Regions:
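N-terminal leader/targeting and accessory segments in enzymes
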Residues: 2, 22-122, 126
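Phosphate-binding loop of NTP-binding sites
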Residues: 36-39, 119-237, 241
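Short "domain-exit" segments at the C-terminal end of structured domains
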Residues: 242-247
Length: 247
């Protein structure tokens, strides 16, 4: 990595942490009560009223990763219907399940939504609004994952840094990455990938990166973006949520 870039990123995170010191972190899913989540996703809650004050420990779309007091979001895919795993999610300790279908058991906490995919983005945007943590957003036609790994490695030398796992960089993966941020994290490095116009605006709204990195402007996804100018316009929207931040 270019030494000047490494020094800049380290100094930027350090300055942000200094500015935010004393404000309180409020990021261990604090504020993510079932009541707040229901409001964030504009959903319909059913179940015990007292459970609405429960704070979530985690949010997942994979029934194999359900945690005690977590939220299981039952996404219906082309081959797998998450709704079939709702009973098992409760048995594994989930405090609540979310789905587009009506609840089959109204005695358990349950949130019905119009779209689970949109609900994931809405929850991530809400949770991100509670986070006082410097975020580096990375995009580009190629080299995103390598650049993410390098920047995370540099920051990890001084800060407890969360990074995107694998290529969880789309409108499903980014929210799941945001949900992994915990109280001990001091910085986050988020990879953001797109293939069409409009996607970056939605991703940037979720991630709200303090510092943005574009690796390059190539010829990927021209079937949707038209030409390299289209790629440039689409990727440049990474900073739209925080236009005064470093870019």
């Amino acid at each position: 990595m270019i030494p000047e870039l490494a020094e800049y990123l380290t100094n930027t995170v350090s300055a942000m942490l200094d500015l935010r010191a004393g404000k309180g972190w409020n990021i261990l899913m604090k504020g993510m009560t079932l009541e707040a989540v229901t409001q964030a996703v504009k959903g319909i809650y059913t179940g015990p009223e007292e459970a609405k004050k429960s704070e979530l420990s985690a949010i997942t779309i994979d029934s194999r990763q359900v945690e005690k007091d977590g939220l299981f979001v039952a996404i219906k895919g082309a081959r797998v219907d998450g709704n079939t795993f709702v009973p098992g999610a409760y048995e594994d300790g989930a405090v609540c399940c979310m789905s587009t279908e009506p609840p089959k058991d109204e005695t358990r906490p349950y949130i019905q939504v119009e779209s689970c995919e949109q609900a994931l983005k809405d929850m991530a945007e809400f949770y991100r609004s509670l986070l006082e943590i410097p975020v580096v957003g990375i995009t580009g036609s190629v080299g995103k994952t390598t650049t993410k790994e390098m920047i995370a490695a540099v920051l990890s030398r001084e800060y407890d840094t969360l990074k995107t796992l694998g290529n969880f960089n789309n409108e499903i993966g980014l929210p799941l990455t945001i949900f992994r941020i915990r109280e001990h994290h001091e910085a986050a490095v988020l990879e953001m990938g797109i293939s069409d116009f409009g996607e970056m605006t939605r991703l940037a709204k979720i991630a709200r990166p303090d510092t943005c990195v574009i690796t390059n402007i190539g010829t990927c996804h021209l079937e949707n973006l038209g030409d390299r100018d289209g790629v440039l316009r689409a990727l440049s929207l990474i900073h739209i949520s925080e236009p005064t931040r470093p870019y």
